């Protein structure tokens, strides 16, 4: 099952050339960027691990691409994404986020249903990947 989080998530995976074009857009707008990774793909997991430091005042997209490449080498079977932040209004708001790397096998999710009083149904998602310990999921 393909995880669909962030911009472009319903499109085929971006090539490095397409990623470079998005990074050039980020730099041209003066946005800050960062690279994050995780092996827990749950949609509500908003606490991905930060790779290195946030890239403030970057003038060249190749600096961000270098960080992506470094993260890919160190974490080849993890989800890796780029976030871009705009601070023009005095706050850091995420304006662009997209996945640049995926595990070869994405095991998917289990939908758990529970019956409650009054014919109420409650649902929860469980990622099959999290059945293994962190760092050994893919």
Swiss-Prot record:
The keyword Plastid applies. GO terms for cellular component: chloroplast. It comes from the Eukaryota. The keyword Metal-binding does not apply. Its main location: plastid. Transmembrane segments: none annotated. Keywords: Calvin cycle, Carbon dioxide fixation, Chloroplast, Photorespiration, Photosynthesis, Plastid. One of its GO terms (molecular function) is ribulose-bisphosphate carboxylase activity. It is found in: Plastid, Chloroplast. InterPro entries: RuBisCO_ssu, RuBisCO_ssu_dom, RuBisCO_ssu_sf. In this alga, in contrast to plants, the small subunit is encoded in the chloroplast. RuBisCO catalyzes two reactions: the carboxylation of D-ribulose 1,5-bisphosphate, the primary event in carbon dioxide fixation, as well as the oxidative fragmentation of the pentose substrate in the photorespiration process. Both reactions occur simultaneously and in competition at the same active site. Although the small subunit is not catalytic it is essential for maximal activity. Belongs to the RuBisCO small chain family. This is Ribulose bisphosphate carboxylase small subunit. The lineage of its organism: Eukaryota, Rhodophyta, Bangiophyceae, Bangiales, Bangiaceae.
């Amino acid at each position: 099952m393909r995880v669909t989080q962030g911009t472009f998530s319903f499109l085929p995976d971006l090539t490095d050339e397409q990623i470079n074009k998005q990074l050039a857009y980020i730099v041209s707008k003066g946005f800050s960027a960062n690279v994050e990774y995780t092996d827990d793909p749950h949609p509500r997991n908003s606490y991905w691990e930060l790779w290195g430091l946030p890239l403030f005042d970057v003038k060249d997209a190749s600096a961000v691409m270098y960080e992506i490449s470094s993260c890919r080498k160190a974490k080849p079977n993890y989800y890796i994404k780029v976030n871009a932040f705009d601070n023009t209004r005095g706050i850091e708001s995420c304006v662009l986020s997209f996945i640049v790397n995926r595990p070869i096998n994405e095991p998917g999710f289990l939908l758990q249903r529970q019956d409650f009083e009054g014919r109420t149904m409650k649902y929860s998602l469980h990622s099959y990947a999290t059945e293994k310990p962190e760092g050994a999921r893919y």
